Curated annotation (Swiss-Prot):
Record-linked Pfam families: PDCD2_C (PF04194)
UniProt modified residues of type Phosphoserine: S20
Distribution of this protein across tissues and organs: Higher expression in lung, colon, mammary gland, cervix, stomach and small intestine.
Location of N-acetylalanine modifications: A2
Gene: PDCD2L
Sites of Phosphothreonine modification: T22
Protein name as annotated: Programmed cell death protein 2-like
InterPro entries: PDCD2-like_regulator, PDCD2_C
UniProt record, GO biological process: apoptotic process
Role this protein plays: Over-expression suppresses AP1, CREB, NFAT, and NF-kB transcriptional activation, and delays cell cycle progression at S phase.
Length: 358
């Protein structure tokens, strides 16, 4: 039986973030750039580059709670924007996960007793239910959520919950002022779309144009590259060619994103990442969660279109990458009364040709 494909949600750049939002309106929003927002009772991450020692700039903030879970959940991805660290690899990138209770302690305990079978919340406010994967398994299932969708919030009065947290969040924010000189990218909200909504509008002209340029540089025949990536007579076998595996991986990447080239983020909890280059042993040798020892799973990745959107608010900063693969604790563990963000893991795949995405 064929494996059930996990749904994929796409993150797109939306409106600029104006001013300095605070409270739940800030930390329940997904965004690129700006200042990292902190959940109530959890300190905002302030990482530094392991290569140069300078503060890291926030690349994206993703609000991704679980329906049925007692926790708010926030992920931050940081990078070093210093020119000398553009090729610093994992030492110049950091990922952090923060969680805090969104219901009183007694209700949280009752929710935990109901088991780990958690459905996914929608990723954006007012979004339609794009279909949760109903495949049975012991692990919770995640998607992203921008707000309080009635279909997923069910009978919980989220407005009251968030209002109760405003004062506490304001106090925490006052206790952790933004350090002067913190590198910042201009902030924009991230909106969401279902990748399936783009399937009927695929235009491969742009992908083919880029691949023709690639072919001329590498001396590779286009028909070979295409045949290596297309099914043969409807089955799962591919034609055998002399194409390098890296070229096949690259073409599959370009073909998949052709329908929505402006995507800056792909989210598919426990799904399959879209590799830009051939995966290395890092993918099969992921480090275990440092807190619970459990395994990590793929959650989302940052896409090449994001690079040109990371415009600096100061100091002329920039980052370069092909795609960033983010892996998080499968159990999304969070000890009682924990108050500091937990570090997760990311894999950096460099752009095989930076000019292709500009």
């Amino acid at each position: 039986m064929a494996a059930v494909l996990k749904p994929v949600l796409l993150g797109l750049r939306d409106a600029p973030v104006h001013g300095s939002p605070t409270g739940p309106g800030a930390w329940t929003a997904s965004k690129l750039g700006g200042i990292p927002d902190a959940l109530p009772t959890v300190a905002a991450p302030r990482p530094v580059c392991q290569r140069c020692g300078q503060p890291l700039a926030l690349v994206v903030q993703v609000y991704c709670p679980l329906e049925g879970s007692p926790f708010h959940r926030l992920l931050h991805v940081f990078a070093c924007a210093c020119p000398g660290c553009s090729t610093g690899g994992a030492r110049s990138w950091k990922v952090f996960r923060s969680q805090c209770l969104q219901v009183p302690e007694r209700e949280a305990q009752d929710a935990q007793k109901q088991g780990n079978s958690l459905a996914a919340e929608d990723w954006c406010e007012g979004a339609d239910d794009w279909g949760s994967d109903t495949e049975e398994g012991p692990s919770p299932q995640f998607t992203l959520d921008f707000g309080n969708d009635a279909s997923s919030a069910k009978d919980v009065d989220w407005t009251a919950r968030l209002q109760d947290l405003r004062l506490q969040d304001a106090v925490l924010g006052a206790a952790h002022p933004v350090p002067p000189g913190l590198p910042l990218f201009l902030p924009y909200y991230i909106c969401v779309a279902d990748e399936d909504d783009y399937r009927d509008f695929v235009n491969l002209d742009h992908a083919h144009s880029l691949l023709r340029d690639y072919q001329q540089r590498e001396g590779i025949a286009m028909d070979q590259l295409l045949s290596q990536s297309l099914p043969n007579d409807g089955d799962e076998k591919y034609e055998k060619t002399i194409i390098k595996s890296g070229d096949q991986t690259f073409y599959k990447f370009m073909k998949r994103i052709a329908a929505c080239q402006e995507q800056i983020l792909r989210y598919s909890w426990s799904g399959e990442p879209l590799f830009l280059t051939c995966p290395t042993s890092e993918v099969t040798e992921l480090p275990a969660c440092s807190q619970c020892g459990g395994q990590r799973i793929f959650e989302f990745q940052l896409m090449p279109a994001l690079v040109s959107m990371l415009k600096s608010a100061n100091l002329g900063l920039s980052v370069e990458f092909g795609t960033i693969l983010v892996y998080t604790c499968e159990k999304s563990c969070w000890p009682p009364n924990h108050q500091t963000p937990m570090e997760e893991f990311c894999i950096i795949q460099e752009d095989p040709d930076e000019l292709l995405f500009k």
